[in-house]
Swiss-Prot record:
Record text about domains: Comprises two domains: an N-terminal domain containing the nucleotidyltransferase activity and a C-terminal HD domain associated with both phosphodiesterase and phosphatase activities.
Record's function text: Catalyzes the addition and repair of the essential 3'-terminal CCA sequence in tRNAs without using a nucleic acid template. Adds these three nucleotides in the order of C, C, and A to the tRNA nucleotide-73, using CTP and ATP as substrates and producing inorganic pyrophosphate. tRNA 3'-terminal CCA addition is required both for tRNA processing and repair. Also involved in tRNA surveillance by mediating tandem CCA addition to generate a CCACCA at the 3' terminus of unstable tRNAs. While stable tRNAs receive only 3'-terminal CCA, unstable tRNAs are marked with CCACCA and rapidly degraded.
Record-listed ATP binding positions: 8, 11, 91, 137, 140
Further information: A single active site specifically recognizes both ATP and CTP and is responsible for their addition.
Protein name: Multifunctional CCA protein
Organism: Acinetobacter baumannii (strain SDF)
Pfam family name, one: PolyA_pol_RNAbd
Reaction catalysed by this enzyme: a tRNA precursor + 2 CTP + ATP = a tRNA with a 3' CCA end + 3 diphosphate; a tRNA with a 3' CCA end + 2 CTP + ATP = a tRNA with a 3' CCACCA end + 3 diphosphate
Record: residues binding Mg(2+): 21, 23
The protein's required cofactors: Mg(2+); Ni(2+)
InterPro entries: CCA_bact, HD/PDEase_dom, HD_domain, NT_sf, PolA_pol_head_dom, PolyA_RNA-bd, tRNA_CCA-adding_enzyme
Subunit structure: Monomer. Can also form homodimers and oligomers.
Positions bound to CTP: 8, 11, 91, 137, 140
One GO BP annotation of this record: tRNA 3'-terminal CCA addition
């Protein structure tokens, strides 16, 4: 039997990038051979084994044939006659269809090295169209390799468009869409993922709420980029640039969904877009089964981001209630995530990317002030329900003093 390193590890090795995961394909072996050598079977749909010592994945070389719709609609065939070339041709992109043997010799039957050199993302064969998840995977690779100058081959983008138009994307499960999208959101250029999906016509099928933002105008004095969709992707790029968490990136992505629902007669103003956004954000999160914590921050940012922009003019009581809704006393990290998302929104505007956002520091200081006031600070004779009422009173008074000090400093 022959063992080859395949896929992403070989691709990244040839690019000179670091890699963690190693996947191997085994040619000329049977499940019985693998078990006899101590490998542990883990594959449900096809024979995949874990190495007894390294726990790395070893898959028997296989072919596959489309038998139904969607990601799971395949029949797999594996035996000792399946060659390395047979296994590699079923892979998505030529740059992922390269193998390396244990002596370091490269096997590249489909031109992957040439495409690496020319910075091209190209499908291996027409079988690419049999798996709709590959549309999302290619979009994610476009995001990952964007800084290195990679582009999708025109014929591959055309095939992705055909797949999007065919309705095959509807067969993808919410879990698969979210898994691929959450991985894409953590790329350094996550905006390219969504732009690529839009370019191939997949965005309107998978994320209609986001697709609807493109072409919707905003007031140019506040948004020089004008287009709501462009603003959304610019804001997302700010979150990526700052290396923020998945929760923050997703919240930034959906913060303005309400603008797509603004009545035409009100454009380019978007009064009450925060309230209008609650329904589409909720729908998107429920459809994709977005984790609860991620959904909660997204809804908070959607509902409250204008208050963060206007924070210095908020009345102390209004600011306290905002902090309360963000669960400032139990979850200060959520307030921080909220501030980060709002700052990305403010900086996701053409020509304003580097403008200071003093509201962020103001919010952080306000958070520290209310968190510093404890029960021990109250008079000893306060009992029962009065304790909670007086804590609120003390916190609002402290915020009022903070606001006055801030205004005095800014006017001095």
């Amino acid at each position: 039997m022959q063992v080859y390193l395949v896929g992403g590890a070989v691709r990244d090795y040839l690019l000179g990038h670091s890699y963690q995961e190693k996947d191997y394909v085994v040619v000329g072996a049977t499940p019985e051979h693998m078990l006899a050598q101590g490998f542990q079977p883990v594959g449900k749909d096809f024979p995949v084994f874990l190495h007894p010592e390294t726990k790395e994945e070893y898959a028997l070389a296989r072919t596959e044939r489309k038998s139904g719709q969607g990601y799971h609609g395949f029949q797999f065939f594996t035996d000792t006659t399946v060659s390395l070339e047979d296994d590699l041709i079923r892979r998505d992109l030529t740059i992922n269809a390269i193998a390396m043997d244990q002596d370091g010799k490269i096997y590249d039957p489909y031109g992957g090295q040439n495409d690496l050199e020319n910075k091209i993302l190209r499908h291996v064969s027409e079988a690419f169209a049999e798996d709709p998840l590959r549309v999302l995977r290619v979009a994610r690779f476009a995001a990952r390799y964007f800084p290195y100058g990679f582009q999708i081959a025109p014929e591959t983008l055309q095939l992705m468009q055909t797949m999007a138009d065919s309705g095959e994307l509807d067969a993808l499960t919410p879990e698969r869409v979210w898994k691929e999208t959450s991985r894409a959101l953590m790329e350094n250029h996550a905006d390219i993922y969504f732009q690529t999906l839009r370019d191939c016509g997949a965005l309107k099928h998978l994320f209609p709420e986001i697709d609807a933002l493109f072409g919707v105008p905003q007031r140019p004095e506040y948004h020089p980029e004008v287009d709501c969709g462009i603003h959304t992707l610019m804001s997302l790029q700010q979150a990526c640039k700052s290396n923020y968490s998945l929760d923050v990136r997703f919240a930034v992505l959906v913060h303005d969904l309400g603008k797509a629902l603004t009545p035409a007669k009100e454009l380019p103003r978007h009064i009450m877009h925060e309230e209008r956004g609650i329904k589409p954000v909720t729908q998107l999160c429920e459809r994709l089964r977005v984790p609860t914590q991620t959904k909660q921050l997204a809804l908070s940012v959607c509902k409250e981001h204008l208050k963060c922009h206007q924070i210095m003019s908020l009345k102390p009581g209004t600011l306290w209630r905002l902090l309360q809704r963000l669960d400032v006393l139990r979850r200060p990290e959520r307030v921080e995530a909220f501030v980060q998302a709002c700052e990305c929104d403010a900086k996701g505007r053409l020509g304003l990317e580097d403008r200071p956002y003093p509201q962020a520091q103001y919010m952080r200081e306000a958070m520290q002030i209310v968190r510093s006031i404890k029960v021990q600070d109250l008079p000893e004779n306060i009992k029962g329900a009065e304790i909670g009422e007086m804590l609120i009173q003390y916190r609002i008074e402290a915020l009022a003093e903070f606001k006055n000090q801030h205004q005095s400093l800014s006017h001095s």
